Amino acid sequence: MTTDFTRKGFLGFGGAFLATGGLDAGAAAAGAESVPCAGTFDLVVAGGSATGVCAAVTAARKGLKVALVEYNAFFGGMATSALVPVWHSLYSTDGKTQIIGGLTEEIEKRLAARGEIEFKDRTDPSVGCYFNTAAMQLVLDELVTEQPTITTFFKAQVVGAEKDREGHLTAAVIEDKSGRRALKAKWFVDATGDADLAARAGFETWKLPKSEIQAHTLCAIFANVGPIYDKYKAFVLNEILKPEFGAGLRHVFGWWAPVVGAHDLYFYAGTRITDCDPSVAEDLTQALLEARRQIRKIVDAVNRKYSMPDGKRFTLVSLASDLGLRESRHIKAKYRVTEKDVLYGRHFEDCIAKGSYRVDIHEGRGIKFRYLDGKEQKMEAQADGKVAWTEGRWRTDSDPRPTWYEIPLRALQPEKAENLICAGRMIDCTREAFGALRVMVNCNQMGEAAANHVVRQLQCA
């Protein structure tokens, strides 16, 4: 089935959102004056994902004293704790122009020096490279520990903020093994993914209705996939998700690949969690339990269907400690990026990042893709377990075809914030634009850009 998606229809396509403001007054006012101070810095970076590391390292290399706060025991966020082993292309959609460099490229080169990354076709709309997620932890450790002016706080979360006037922060309050402590600073970067610092400091945030928030995925690594392929040449792991195989799941698509450096192991992203707002503790808890239930169902279904010699079994060897989270809170910023901005390649005077990843929206029982060249694809699970693919166009062939898009600094700047800037998936953008902007290679650039903005502001002070 082919459908013509006109430009008129495209421009009218949008989604509702819910304004949430900051957190309640008690959370936002968890003040620094009543807790001991753990240090005074030029910059506090909340969130030690790859995005947060890019922000901290960029600032430290330019002479700033930085505190880096991460709730896990290691850096990397989705690239490590969620076992997501993919970064998308650093090139334009035609593969002719490198549009992303900086620390993202440096990280890839460090992984490549040890054979811990595998590059794909630079024009591939899905995958730029696969990397070993454990090796990624070590590379990010190296980047941070090479900078003597970065102080790291692992197993720590931002629980509040202190302001001396509206829009001006003086400290972030964290909770870690040593208790509740304040980190004082001149500037702050929120790289938490969920806009935790911005919300706790009382800045306005918003989020979509729960039913429209993108679906989340728990990833896992499995052993003994090779023997199944050897015996069953037509084996496709996604087939297990179909109703007739008894896994009891509601979708029939996933994504898998050999683990870099250990091709006898396979990464798999085949779970699907909908109607979950990960900024709500109860939602996140139930999502984790449900995702792990789905993993067990997948393992059991494979072992029922496929027998292997020598008593071998399809075996779960590693389970992500975090959900692969796609979306939660967004900040209310000075500018909201739209799908038109992305897919028509709008240029911004305050451009701080470029990207070429397609619009990719995980919704309900399916996925929708929109490409810069005007193509649209939809994939949806049917009641009978089959996947229905439809292709069409969201714009006419006569429209210009950009090969990349730009991200403006204003979309990272919360309204009324004097010394807070954000980086990552809390960017202010429409649901459709977010489908493209949310991927890690884009977020990493936001981290670097946020740090560079802080450096410029401090130099001008």
Predicted features and spans:
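N-terminal Rossmann-fold NAD(P) dinucleotide-binding loop
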Residues: 52
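A short, basic/flexible loop-to-alpha-helix module at the beginning of a structural domain
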Residues: 28-39
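A short, glycine/Asx- and small/polar-enriched loop/turn
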Residues: 164-170
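Flavin (FAD/FMN)-binding glycine-rich loop and adjacent Rossmann-like elements that form
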Residues: 155, 171, 175-187, 191-461
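Beta1/beta-strand and adjacent pyrophosphate-binding region of the FAD-binding site
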Residues: 38-49
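N-terminal secretory signal peptides and thylakoid transit peptides that target proteins
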Residues: 1-18
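Conserved N-terminal/central alpha/beta ligand/cofactor-binding core
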Residues: 13, 58, 64-65, 70-160, ...
